[in-house]
Regions:
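A short glycine/small-residue-enriched secondary-structure motif
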Residues: 43-56, 88-99, 253-258
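A generic alpha-helix surface/boundary motif
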Residues: 28-29, 70-71, 99-103, 160, ...
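Glycine-rich cofactor/substrate-binding loops
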Residues: 1-26, 36-39, 46, 50, ...
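Alpha-helical bundle segments that constitute or directly flank the non-heme di-iron/ferroxidase center
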Residues: 18-29, 114-117, 121, 226, ...
Length: 420
């Protein structure tokens, strides 16, 4: 991952040294269980814990073995010395790699979940602040009816909350490891030893395993991340729309000294939201790769491995960066209430059309006849007052209450309850 989009915690989790340290943790925990079960002599796990395997050592050994896990095991055994034959006893590479991956993905999800929770708090705070701010709603990019800005933000909040729930479920789905050997049939290691070892690591056993932890588990994680990224893309796209010159209702924060363009000094571009939209495309592509990784031959092949070395750390770095970026935008975005009110006024003759239609229908006028008349008159009259007067004259009906503030917009009394 390029430095521009790195998250410090995620980068640490997925750096090679931490990966090798996690492999060592799995080996140490496994040997500890062998000791407790009387299979291995006591003290070997302590020796494993006391030594370190440096990334550079693995790189150098891999030049000979062409296998990173085998290189790691060679170095670890050499450093432990007597009793090291119990290291990797009865295991295959995927037992260590996949169990470690589950630990690292879980840890990454915990980082992401905290960031998403912070984002939710910011959205909720802004929604509460703007719960009574009227704004013109738009469907298909066209004026529709008035709504509350707080409702729009509340809609975003609940969507992100559903994403939080999906990520939590995915965390449970990925909390599985395996120590059942080359094809998952416990040739050497017993199910009891596997269960006890994985329990110490806060993982569960993959039942009916092949050589690997099933990749549908990975696909669920990256599908959840992809949905989250797409939710961010939707929010970012709307923020970009609000910042259009002809709308100018909501603006991203613009720092002192910032330049919006190298050529045009007047420019204040929504670069943060645009960045989120761009990065979401990468995340969605990676989720497709994770689905492709489900399709492996028989008990496994390694066509998934090269893909995962890229998409796992990159996905977590990018989605955490996106979350932090969107949190900052939401927290600091500038809401132009004056322009919001101007746009409301400009849209008034259109935003009342359904209310006028309902009044006419309630007074016994044929719905289609009323609809066609309103449709025609709206395009002939530029203001709400002119429209109402024309309709009153055509249908001999009193519409004086249509533009009363109490009738202009729906009920918002239960606003705070909707966050629960």
């Amino acid at each position: 991952m390029i430095n521009r989009y790195k998250n410090q915690k995620i980068s640490y989790i997925w750096n090679d040294q931490n990966k090798f340290d996690t492999w060592k943790k799995v080996q140490e925990t496994y040997v500890k269980t062998l000791e407790e079960e009387g299979v291995a002599k006591p003290g070997i796990s302590e020796k494993i814990a006391s030594v370190s395997v440096e990334a550079e050592e693995v790189y150098e050994r891999e030049k000979v073995t062409n296998h990173d896990l085998a290189s790691f095991v060679d170095i670890l055994q050499n450093k432990v010395g007597e009793g090291s034959n119990w290291i990797h006893y009865g295991l295959t590479s995927s037992d260590v790699v996949d169990t470690s991956n589950s630990l690292l993905i879980k840890e990454s999800l915990e980082v992401l979940l905290k960031l998403v929770d912070d984002l939710l708090n910011e959205i909720k705070n802004r929604a509460i602040d703007e719960q009574n701010t009227k704004i013109i709603g738009r469907t298909h990019g066209v004026f529709a009816e008035e709504t509350f800005l707080g409702n729009i933000l509340g809609n975003w909040y609940l969507e992100i909350k559903r994403n939080l729930d999906r990520l939590s479920t995915a965390k449970e789905t990925i909390s599985y490891g395996k120590l059942s050997g080359p094809v998952g049939n416990y040739t050497v290691v017993t199910p009891e030893i596997e269960d006890k070892t994985l329990k110490k690591l806060n993982l569960k056993s993959e039942k009916f395993a092949s050589q690997i932890v099933s990749r549908d588990r990975y696909a669920e994680v990256f599908s959840a991340i992809s949905i989250l990224a797409s939710s961010y893309d939707r929010i970012a796209g709307n923020l970009r729309s609000y910042q259009r010159s002809e709308i100018s209702e909501i603006f991203e924060p613009f720092k002192d000294g910032q330049k919006g363009s190298s050529a045009m000094p007047h420019k204040k571009n929504p670069i943060g939201s645009e960045r989120i939209s761009g990065l979401s495309r990468i995340i969605r592509g990676y989720s497709i790769s994770s689905l492709e990784n489900m399709v492996l031959w028989n008990e496994r092949d390694i066509s998934n491995s090269s893909v995962e070395r890229i998409i796992i750390p990159d996905s977590f770095n990018i989605i955490c960066f996106m979350t932090t970026e969107l949190t900052s935008i939401i927290k600091n975005m500038v809401i132009n209430h004056e322009q919001i009110n101007k746009n409301l006024e400009n849209a008034k003759n259109k935003s009342i059309s359904q209310r006028v239609l309902s009044v006419l229908v309630n007074n016994g006028i044929d719905r289609d006849n009323a609809y066609r008349s309103i449709q025609s008159l709206i395009f002939e009259n530029n203001s709400a007052e002119e429209l109402i007067k024309a309709i009153e004259e055509e249908f001999d009906i009193d519409l004086s209450n249509i533009t009363n503030s109490e009738n202009e917009i729906g009920n918002n009394d239960s606003f705070l309850d909707k966050f629960n």
